[in-house]
Structures are given as structure tokens and as C-alpha cells.
């Protein structure tokens, strides 16, 4: 059986890892083993944080909506409840955009939500 020389592939693999690790501090950018561990962890962090980013943005949108809703005399919870009762299907991203860029349209939505809410908070829901 012919001998297989793997030096070219091994060097290519190591060079690829070290290129990915460029910019890391200390041994993590220079030593293959340390760089490989750090690149693996970095990819895991990257994957997890892409998932986490979605929740972070939702949290930001809710804070913006809540601030604008309170400026219009209603809480976030009652505002969303009123929009659902009025069958207004606008997601939180768009609501946050309206709250920041178009306060008049947001105020109109607040009016719609307030009209759809029962006047008595403790009143039973109509089935």
C-alpha cells in the first residue's frame, strides 16, 4: 500500500483554524490547540447569541411600547389586551417603530385599544 503524506492537509487545516483565531489574545491566536478550543467556543457563543438576540429585541420593543403607552395614559398590559380585543394584529416590532417614529398613529392605536377594553377592569369577559 502506498504511503500517504498528510502534511499539506494538516498544515491547511491548522492554518484555517489559526486564521479564524486571528485577533484573539495571547496563546489563543498563536497555538493551534488553544486556538482550536477558542474557535469552537466562539462558534458556540455565536450560535447561542443569535438565538438570544431575538429575545433581546423583543424585550427592547416591549420597553419602547410600554413607555409610549404610559405617555398616552395606559399600561403596556392593558394596551396589548385592548388590541387583542379589537382584533388588531400588529406585532411588537411595528408597534415599537410607530411609538418612536409616528406618535400620532400610536396614539390612534391606543384609542382603539381603550375603546375595545371593558370600562370595569374586574368585569367578566363576554363569551
Curated annotation (Swiss-Prot):
A GO BP term here is: translation
What the entry lists under PROSITE patterns is as follows: RIBOSOMAL_L20 (PS00937)
Name one cellular component (GO) term. cytosolic large ribosomal subunit
Q: Which InterPro entries match?
A: Ribosomal_bL20 (IPR005813), RIBOSOMAL_L20_CS (IPR049946), Ribosomal_protein_bL20_C (IPR035566)
A Gene Ontology molecular function term of the record? structural constituent of ribosome
Q: One Pfam family, short name please?
A: Ribosomal_L20
Q: Which UniProt keywords apply?
A: Ribonucleoprotein, Ribosomal protein, RNA-binding, rRNA-binding
Question: Function, please?
Answer: Binds directly to 23S ribosomal RNA and is necessary for the in vitro assembly process of the 50S ribosomal subunit. It is not involved in the protein synthesizing functions of that subunit.
Q: Which family does it belong to?
A: Belongs to the bacterial ribosomal protein bL20 family.
* Protein name according to UniProt: Large ribosomal subunit protein bL20
Encoding gene (name) = rplT
Amino acid at each position: 500500500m502506498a504511503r500517504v503524506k498528510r502534511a499539506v492537509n494538516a498544515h491547511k487545516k491548522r492554518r484555517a483554524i489559526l486564521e479564524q483565531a486571528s485577533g484573539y489574545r495571547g496563546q489563543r491566536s498563536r497555538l493551534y490547540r488553544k486556538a482550536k478550543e477558542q474557535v469552537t467556543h466562539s462558534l458556540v457563543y455565536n450560535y447561542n447569541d443569535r438565538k438570544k438576540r431575538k429575545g433581546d429585541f423583543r424585550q427592547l420593543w416591549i420597553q419602547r411600547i410600554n413607555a409610549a403607552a404610559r405617555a398616552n395614559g395606559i399600561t403596556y398590559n392593558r394596551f396589548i389586551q385592548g388590541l387583542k380585543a379589537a382584533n388588531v394584529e400588529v406585532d411588537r416590532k411595528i408597534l415599537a417603530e410607530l411609538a418612536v417614529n409616528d406618535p400620532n398613529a400610536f396614539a390612534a392605536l391606543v384609542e382603539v385599544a381603550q375603546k375595545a377594553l371593558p370600562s370595569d377592569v374586574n368585569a367578566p369577559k363576554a363569551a
